[in-house]
């Protein structure tokens, strides 16, 4: 793919524009991000692409990060049927195919995230899916010993699903459970929600993750998270390395810019969306169509 180009109003020479692309790669995003940062050092510099300022503005107003709005809107003159179809393809290509849990490869699966995102309920939904739809033997483990009634909550789910639930307060207790793990296809590990500003709790999680040696990690985030908070959370959980994103509470907002922005900030793939409290019904594979429909609603 050719490198995306932008026009600076104050520039002396005109810059040619690239042909609109159907597929956007992470390389394209990084190139555009670096280019815009270089050009936009002057406070009053205005940046826009040929014929797409209005479309880019719509994406910005929706809440999408500036550089990503610029890239998604490149070459789209208006949101007519052709423009909508191109935007839909770009959003789908940017997010990529959802990457759900592979129960055939992953044994120990860890779920992390801030407080209040509905992590425990999400774990229960995935456990239910594995049991009812894939016929897997599942064990639930909770490392949440901080929240009042945390164990009772996940234990109630375990009782309903007919699966064992174990509680651990540290990684040493977790390792003592290893002999039991061999009797199950998948072990889902719930952790305490941690504020990204609570250094002590975050460091405890780092230690647990280092020695737990889990096969997959999922970062649970709420679709209602404020933009600045989202950026800080993504940065704080950077230590997790390779992980997948789960977005919860889609039923509590009509704006899903946080999903696009989180993928943009982190470079990590999405897996699931949740849109309610019902176990197991309110769980779905991440779907770019939902985000696109929200953006173009009213056009």
Predicted segments with their positions:
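Non-catalytic terminal/linker segments enriched in charged/polar, low-complexity residues
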Residues: 1-99
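Pre-Walker A (Motif I) flank of P-loop NTPase domains
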Residues: 105-109
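Switch II (G3) loop of P-loop NTPases
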Residues: 112-115, 134, 138-149, 158-204
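Conserved lysine of the Walker
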Residues: 119
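Hydrophobic positions on the alpha1 helix immediately C-terminal to the Walker A/P-loop
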Residues: 122, 126, 153
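Walker A/P-loop NTP-binding motif
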Residues: 128-132
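Conserved catalytic-core segment of NTP-binding enzymes
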Residues: 153, 170-180, 186, 194-298
């Amino acid at each position: 793919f050719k490198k995306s180009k932008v026009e600076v109003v104050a520039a002396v020479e005109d810059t040619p524009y690239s042909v609109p692309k159907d597929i956007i790669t992470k390389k394209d995003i990084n190139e555009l991000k670096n280019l815009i940062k270089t050009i936009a050092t002057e406070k009053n510099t205005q940046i826009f692409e040929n014929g797409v300022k209005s479309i880019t503005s719509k994406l910005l107003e929706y809440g999408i990060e500036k550089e990503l709005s610029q890239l998604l809107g490149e070459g789209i003159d208006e949101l007519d049927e052709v423009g909508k179809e191109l935007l839909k393809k770009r959003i789908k290509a940017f997010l990529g195919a959802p990457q759900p849990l592979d129960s055939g490869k992953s044994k120990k699966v860890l779920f992390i995230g801030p407080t209040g995102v509905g992590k425990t309920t999400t774990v229960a939904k995935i456990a239910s899916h594995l049991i009812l739809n894939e016929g897997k033997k599942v064990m639930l483990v909770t490392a949440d010993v901080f929240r009042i009634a945390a164990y009772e909550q996940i234990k109630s789910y375990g009782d309903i699903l007919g699966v064992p639930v174990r509680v651990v307060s540290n990684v040493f207790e977790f390792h003592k459970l290893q002999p039991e793990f061999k009797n199950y296809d998948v072990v889902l590990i719930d952790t305490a929600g941690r504020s990204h500003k609570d250094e002590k709790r975050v460091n405890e999680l780092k230690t647990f993750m280092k020695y737990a040696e889990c096969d997959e990690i999922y970062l649970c985030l709420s679709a209602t998270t404020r933009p600045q908070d989202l950026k800080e959370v993504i940065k704080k959980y950077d230590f997790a390395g390779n992980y997948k994103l789960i977005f919860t509470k889609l039923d509590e907002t009509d704006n899903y810019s946080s999903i696009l922005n989180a993928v943009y900030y982190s470079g990590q793939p999405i897996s699931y969306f949740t849109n309610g409290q019902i176990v197991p019904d309110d769980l779905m594979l991440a779907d770019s169509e939902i985000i696109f429909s929200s953006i173009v609603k009213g056009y």
